[in-house]
Amino acid sequence: MAAAHKVFELSHVFKDVSKIGDDESVCSPNEDYFGVPWKIVLRHKDEKMGVFLSCEKPSNNDAHCIVNVVYSVKLMSSSGVCYIKSDSKLFGEITEHGWVNFVNWNTMVDAFLIDDSIIIEVLVKTIFMSGLPKKSPKNFDESNKEFSDGIVVVKHQNFHILKKFLAFHCEYLEKLFFGDFKEAGKAEVTLKAISSTDFHYLLAVLYEDYAIDDDNVGGILRLASYLQVPIVIRKCEQFLIEGSGKPMEIRLDIAEKECLQNLKKHCLSKVGTADQIEAARAILPSDIPKRALKKFDESNKEFSDVIFVVEHNKFYVLKQILASHSSHFKKIFVENVDKREFTLADIDSNDFQNLVEVMYGVSFIDDLTVEGVLHLAHMYDRPFPMQKCVEFLIDLSEKSPKEKLKIAKAYQLKNLEKAALARINLPESIRAALSCDMAQMEVEVLKALMQKALFHLSDTKVHTETFF
């Protein structure tokens, strides 16, 4: 699978352009992506029109931020003429990149100025990001008490957890909580010789509340290997393959130490010699095996306290997992405290299986499952799975922009709509998007597509080069 590059688009109509004096600049409003404010800067200097992409350091972040991007700047006119320049730059100490002489000022006035206004569009694809602000991981202090039945103490820090949920993911903790250990049955257990920070991150990843990154992946992976938590090991490996900015040599070293065969194969294919690659192919699987469905049948009864019946299939699950992510199910459980079995009508059991897997953190959404999971997440008011579906559709899905626009309209997903529109730039993709029932399109979407189509009506392209 390709690396999960982030793509977004900035677009702004600059008005009263004739009033911009020499050596003056005007800016578009800041737009926040990945916790960083971005904007377009238009500058008039020495009869030249400069255009710059600005990536400012967040005011609440003291870390050294680095963002490597490829970007394409397009100056557009309603007559169909467009002028494009592209580049690849590293934002860090330097927060602004672009062209002092994007186009001659008089050329801009003659060819692009309409009603004293011009339209500038910037398409950005991130290659690597580091030091950006992160959201704090989920708290497992007393505020999480409602959704817990036990306490794990690490370095004098109390973590309020759900025993059956952790036991479901970790055989060691299953034995600790419910086996022959002296701690079994106790409300509070202590884990020694591990970092409380790493344990906090591991819990947050298990609860699907925190993203693995280059700063924490080492600690999370070591602890997941020590406690043998397969799903977290798998997620760390996937990040190191798809999203890490660490040098390949370092990732290969991690793969060797932690026996991550898919990561090892990936690294050797990037940096190894022909002999090394051939040797790796001989001992490693050619493809990542298709995952087996996680069973929520009677074999999971020990780690459940409620049953859902869907199309005659019984799913043994934990109330707290469903209630913690869905106000709909929380209300059902509150109103039916003593009820053990519930029936859900008019939904597909495969979709429910996929949804529960996402809630338990044992499945990665893909193009085959995303719409079913999204449908049920929307139906049962589950923001977390919806967020995961949107992230997948924006970052990893191979669905066409037309398909994504259709999904965005069905579930009112504005971020997905904007991301899909940003990827519609070639004439064939514009035609494909416009081939659907335009009467069903949102006015703003139709307007954006028609505007893009207009840019391609003219055969005149003053300059076109792009990395996209």
Curated annotation (Swiss-Prot):
Domain called BTB: residue spans: 148-215, 304-368
Protein name: BTB and MATH domain-containing protein 45
InterPro entries registered for this protein in UniProt: BTB-MATH_domain_protein (IPR052664), BTB/POZ_dom (IPR000210), MATH/TRAF_dom (IPR002083), SKP1/BTB/POZ_sf (IPR011333), TRAF-like (IPR008974)
Superkingdom assignment: Eukaryota
Pfam families found in the cross-reference section: BTB, MATH
Organism the protein comes from: Caenorhabditis elegans
Classification via SMART domains: BTB (SM00225), MATH (SM00061)
Keyword annotations: Repeat
Gene symbol of the encoding locus: bath-45
All copies of domain MATH, residue ranges: 7-124
